[in-house]
């Protein structure tokens, strides 16, 4: 079996449902230490992380990823045990196959192959791996980055191994992500009998015009790299469940996905201004999951674009679509951040899989990128 596929299978066999690492990181660490990496284990709360580095000079290329996976869902819906990798119809099945144990395996084998051919490479190679990406993402990459930043440690380039390919392997490199800002809004009224509305104040009715106005706003037009900022309601709850009671409060949860045309503070101020103008009695809690980031050009994009084209024959598209990733934290200590990995069609689904032929190709793309940036 191909070495990258073999390692991917070993990782899939470990039930690393978030935030449990289940020994995946120690498997990777053992191989990295054999080729000269210094490894720093960083455990925060129940989360395992490690920061590994080979070399002490600049420039530094970092590979970043996560060993944790999402829950399997109903086992009866799987064709086979989700933690027993199975090869069928040209695909490797198992939870985490695409998101992102194939990428983790490809990181390791690409580095092993590169170091074997270039033991005295330029600069440094690093890995940042966490078991807290699919969960709350507080004690994972964010905490590691904060530790690195506190001691003044930065790096030049980072490849996050997220499954970015959309229709065929190699078609997409993510060179940025939108920011994510969520709000939990509680509007207060006066509860009462539904037959006596003059003795109550219905907060749903009070809020409705403000919600309609928020939904109609064109926040910006986007730009060459990002689509327009989006505001969406995710949940609304009000009332006791009874049909004869006017509720005393209504709670609305919403989310902004915002481009570099906006700032979190600017969006917050706009929402507060609108709610105040409508005269609402409200409380509003905010949660900023991450600011937008963008790597428009640079040596890393040039290197990985060339590697993808040489291995797959496809010139990849650069885009910033999709949800957030740990790149939102890494950007604080890294000059250029991109994401590249296998097809994402089955991630978080039952019968998650990755094409068998794509796994060694992924390793070769990472190896060629390393060679382009760090070979002497």
From Swiss-Prot:
Signal peptide residues on this chain, from the entry's feature table: none
Enzyme Commission numbers on file: 3.5.1.18
Residues binding Zn(2+) 2, per UniProt: 99, 134, 348
The keyword DNA damage appears for this protein: no
Listed name of the protein: Succinyl-diaminopimelate desuccinylase
Gene3D superfamilies: Zn peptidases
Organism: Laribacter hongkongensis (strain HLHK9)
Pfam families given in the database record: M20_dimer, Peptidase_M20
SUPFAM superfamilies per UniProt: Bacterial exopeptidase dimerisation domain (SSF55031), Zn-dependent exopeptidases (SSF53187)
């Amino acid at each position: 079996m191909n070495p990258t596929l073999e390692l991917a299978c070993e990782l899939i066999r470990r039930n690393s449902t978030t935030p449990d690492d289940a020994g995946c990181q120690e498997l990777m660490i053992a191989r990295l230490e054999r080729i000269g990496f210094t490894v720093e284990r960083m455990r925060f709360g129940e989360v395992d992380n490690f920061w590994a580095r080979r070399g002490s000079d600049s420039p530094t290329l970092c590979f970043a990823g996560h060993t944790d996976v999402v829950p399997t869902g109903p086992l009866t819906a799987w064709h086979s045990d989700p933690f027993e990798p199975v090869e069928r119809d040209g695909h490797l099945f198992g939870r985490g196959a695409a998101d992102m144990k194939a990428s983790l395996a490809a990181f390791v084998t690409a580095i092993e192959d590169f170091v074997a051919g270039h033991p005295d490479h330029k600069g440094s190679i690093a890995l940042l791996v966490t078991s807290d990406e699919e969960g709350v993402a507080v004690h994972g990459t964010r905490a590691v980055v904060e530790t690195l930043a506190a001691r003044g440690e930065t790096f030049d380039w980072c490849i996050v191994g997220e499954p970015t390919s959309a229709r065929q392997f190699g078609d997409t490199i993510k060179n940025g992500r939108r920011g994510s800002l969520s709000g939990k809004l509680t509007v207060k009224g006066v509860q009462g009998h539904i037959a006596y509305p003059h003795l109550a104040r219905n907060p749903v009715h009070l809020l409705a015009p403000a919600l309609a106005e928020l939904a109609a706003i064109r926040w910006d037009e986007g730009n060459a790299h990002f689509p327009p900022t989006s505001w969406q309601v995710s949940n609304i709850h009000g009332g006791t469940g009874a049909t004869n009671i006017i509720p005393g409060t209504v709670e609305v949860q919403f989310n902004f996905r915002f481009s570099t045309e906006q700032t979190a503070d600017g969006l917050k101020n706009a929402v507060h201004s609108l709610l105040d103008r409508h005269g609402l009695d409200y409380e509003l809690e905010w949660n900023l999951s991450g600011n937008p980031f963008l790597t428009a050009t640079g040596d890393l994009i040039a290197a990985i674009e060339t590697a993808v084209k040489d291995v797959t024959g496809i010139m990849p598209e650069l885009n910033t679509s999709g949800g957030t990733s740990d790149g939102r934290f890494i950007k604080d200590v890294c000059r250029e951040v991109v994401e590249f990995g296998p097809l994402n069609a089955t991630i978080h689904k039952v019968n998650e899989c990755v094409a068998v032929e794509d796994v060694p190709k992924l390793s070769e793309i990472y190896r060629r990128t390393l060679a382009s940036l760090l070979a002497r």
